[in-house]
Every structure is written in C-alpha cells, then in structure tokens.
C-alpha cells in the first residue's frame, strides 16, 4: 500500500465499490444507516454466522426497538432474546452500553470513534463499523476476514495472531479506504472475506480486486495470512443432575456470574476431573 500511487488507489476503490453495489448481500441491518441496528448486528455477528443472526436480529429489534427500551429491559427478557446465540456476556455488555448511552449521551448513539469506543463491549472493529456505516467516517473496521484480505492484497507477513500486528493492518486500511464511501468499503471487505477471499480455496477467479492482489500475482494466496497456531484447548468436564419432585417439577439453579453459562438457569452442575467423569459414564445407574 505504501507503493500505490493515488491513481492506483482510486482505481482500486472504484472497482471495489462498484462490485459491492452489484453483489452486496441483502441483510436486514443494511436497510438503513440506523446506528442502533448496525451496533446490535455487529455484536451479534461476533462468533456467529450471518444466516443464524438474521432471525435473532429481527426478534431483538421487535422486543427492544429503541436504545431506551433496551436499557430499561429486565435482564431475564434480554437473555431470553439472546438465548441460542451463546457468549451471553455480549448481551450484558449491550445493555450496559445502552444504559451508558442514556446517561452520558442523552439517549443518542455517540458519533465520534472516541466516544463510540468508550461504550461497554465495543472494540476497534465495531467502532470502525458503526463510525463508517452509520456516520460516514473513514474509520477502518479490521477483523480476521479483513486482515486475511489485506494480507493477501499486499503480501503482509505480520502474524495476525499477535495483537501488535493490528496496527499494520489498520494503517493499510486507512491508506486504501474510500473516504467518500467508507461504510460501503468496509462492508465490501466483509463480504469479500466471507464469500470469496476465504481461508482455504479462495475463489480468486471471481475476485473483483484480483488484478491488484500481490499474492494472486505471485500464486501464493494460501500462504497468507501468517498465523501462529493457538495452544490446544483444555478439556473441562461437568456432570449435571436432573432433580424432579413428586409433583413433576424440576429443580433449576442460577449459575454464578463468573462461571460457565454465567447467570443462566440450568440443572445443577459440578465440575469434575476426567477420571471422575469417565468413572461416572461407566455406571448404568447413579
């Protein structure tokens, strides 16, 4: 990106935006530039597939059509609306941010990146998405999909698993983002990374920016992005008991806020060792 001329950058932007306008996905949060809808959709899309999010998004907007109603909603209703999406801390952070907006911003979504990022649960990527899509600010939205696209575009060898690498990708995005259409540009990046510039078997023959892609020219697309492998996840074992009284009612308990399934109502659960778990599995009756 450092070697691109202004003319090359402009050609890239024009081709990319033209492709997006023709091929963009029809998603409910793209119907308008309402910052509330954009915010909720971006939080839901973290760790969750687009197809899964759509129905949840419609229901959430029906139950909590305004920031004020979200801020004042009982937590039980909020968690019910979120049920099935997982990562329930996201829902609690959304409500905490809604209360923050009511108390600090007169009930209106803040418009500057600095103010947006001050809200609970909103990091750099979501800040960039809201600022660019809702308010037309040239703020990059950099996530794993975008880093993959940009790393191939410029053959960036920085390890995307390292937090320090984000600055490099952020700098590259600020260089190439279309300042006249920043929201469309960021969404084009999202769509490209999701549908074409995929982790394995990228569809380079249909890519709208293949002529600009350095990795494509060198035939080394699958060498990027550079990413160190994570440590193998540790297995944790739980047992759960279904307790029923003579009238047929079951016993549930609310989980601790700092543990697995925080604040959710479940059958009684207890963490056990692998040996204890395997021994219990071998029993026919407990």
Predicted stretch roles:
Residues 1-8, 15, 19-203, 209-218, ...:
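Catalytic cores of DNA base-excision repair glycosylases
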Residues 12-13, 22, 234, 260:
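A generic structural signal for short, non-catalytic loop/turn and secondary-structure boundary residues
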Residues 33, 86, 134, 233, ...:
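Structured beta->alpha junctions
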Residues 179, 183, 201, 232-235, ...:
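Alpha-helix initiation and capping sites
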Residues 213-214, 257-260, 274:
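Short, catalytically relevant binding-site loops at active-site mouths
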Residues 222-269:
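N-terminal strand-loop-strand
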Residues 269-280:
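N-terminal phosphate-binding loop and adjacent alpha-helix
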Residues 284-286:
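Conserved small/polar residues in nucleotide/adenosyl-binding loops
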């Amino acid at each position: 990106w450092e070697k691109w001329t202004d003319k090359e950058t402009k050609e890239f932007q024009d081709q990319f935006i033209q492709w997006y306008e023709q091929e963009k996905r029809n998603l409910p949060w793209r119907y308008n530039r309402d910052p509330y809808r954009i915010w909720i959709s971006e939080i839901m899309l973290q760790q969750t597939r687009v197809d899964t999010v759509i129905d949840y998004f419609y229901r959430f907007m029906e139950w909590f059509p305004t920031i004020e109603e979200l801020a004042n909603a009982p937590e039980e209703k909020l968690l019910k609306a979120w049920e099935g999406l997982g990562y329930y801390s996201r829902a609690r952070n959304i409500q905490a941010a809604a209360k923050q907006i009511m108390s600090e911003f007169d009930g209106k979504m803040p418009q500057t990146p600095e103010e947006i990022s001050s809200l609970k649960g909103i990091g750099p990527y979501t800040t960039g998405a809201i600022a660019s899509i809702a308010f037309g600010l040239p703020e990059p939205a950099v996530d794993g999909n975008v880093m993959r696209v940009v790393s191939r575009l410029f053959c960036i060898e920085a390890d995307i698993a390292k937090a320090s690498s984000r600055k490099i990708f952020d700098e590259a995005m600020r260089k190439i983002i279309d300042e006249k259409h920043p929201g469309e540009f960021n969404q084009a990046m999202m769509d490209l990374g999701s549908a074409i510039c995929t982790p394995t078997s990228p569809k380079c023959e249909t890519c709208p920016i293949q002529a600009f892609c350095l990795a494509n020219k060198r035939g080394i697309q699958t060498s990027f992005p550079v990413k160190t492998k994570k440590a193998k996840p540790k297995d944790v074992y739980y047992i759960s008991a279904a307790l029923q009284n003579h009238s047929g009612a079951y016993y549930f308990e609310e989980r601790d806020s700092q543990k697995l399934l925080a604040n959710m109502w479940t059958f009684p659960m207890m963490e056990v060792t692998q040996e204890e778990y395997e021994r219990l599995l071998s029993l026919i009756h407990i």
